[in-house]
């Protein structure tokens, strides 16, 4: 019997490669829907979300230069709405699964609720969005409507401080973990 996957030299299972029959320029992030894979690309031919199904069929693109300039991270909710952090425009862009713009929130600034080069994002257990507010050296939590719920962190290297936080995730207990880029932690 042939397994539907292979094993990479690193020891991790390798299941399949999607998207090789088309140009995928500078993939940045990936999200999964019920039947589709969403690949966020930027630069070159990118700045869009490519949609591919599990049969490796190209289902087109969503977003593009009219909605975001320098996309970094992608989230997909249960309704397959797409959330993209746009580093250059300092905002979060929300589209439906067909690519129609629902709303955006965020503007450049250092006050709580404003963003300066947002990067990583994750949903919490309630469906709110936790965002790495990279240049402001903090983490912010918003509703999907863009209402600020929480803001924490400051510039520095002490406990509770960040220097260019980039990635963010949350565990089942609600603890938030941050990849603190310039502090190398």
Protein language model features and the residues they cover:
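Conserved beta-propeller blade signature
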Residues: 36-39, 81-83, 128-130, 175-177
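Beta-rich catalytic cores
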Residues: 25-26, 45, 70, 88, ...
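Beta-strand-rich domains and repeat architectures in extracellular enzymes and scaffolds
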Residues: 16-47
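A short helix->beta-strand "capping" segment at the edge of beta-propeller domains
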Residues: 2-23
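Short loop/turn segments that connect beta-strands within beta-propeller blades
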Residues: 53-57, 96-100, 143-147
């Amino acid at each position: 019997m042939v397994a539907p996957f292979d094993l990479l030299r690193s020891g991790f299972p390798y299941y399949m490669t999607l998207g090789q029959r088309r140009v995928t320029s500078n993939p940045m992030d990936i999200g999964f829907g019920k039947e589709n894979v969403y690949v966020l690309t930027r630069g070159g031919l990118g700045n869009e979300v490519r949609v591919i199904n599990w049969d490796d069929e190209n289902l087109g693109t969503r977003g593009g230069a009219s909605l975001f300039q320098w996309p970094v991270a992608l989230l997909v909710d249960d309704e397959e709405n797409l959330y993209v952090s746009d580093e250059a425009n300092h905002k979060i862009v929300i589209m439906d699964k067909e690519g129609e713009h629902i709303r955006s929130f965020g503007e450049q600034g250092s006050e709580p609720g404003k963003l300066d080069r947002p990067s990583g994002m994750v949903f919490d257990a309630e469906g709110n969005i936790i965002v790495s507010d990279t240049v402001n050296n903090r983490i912010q939590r918003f509703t999907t409507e863009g209402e600020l719920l929480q803001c924490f962190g400051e510039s520095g290297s002490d406990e509770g401080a960040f220097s260019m936080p980039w990635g963010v995730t949350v565990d089942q207990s609600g603890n938030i973990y941050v990849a603190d880029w310039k502090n190398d932690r």
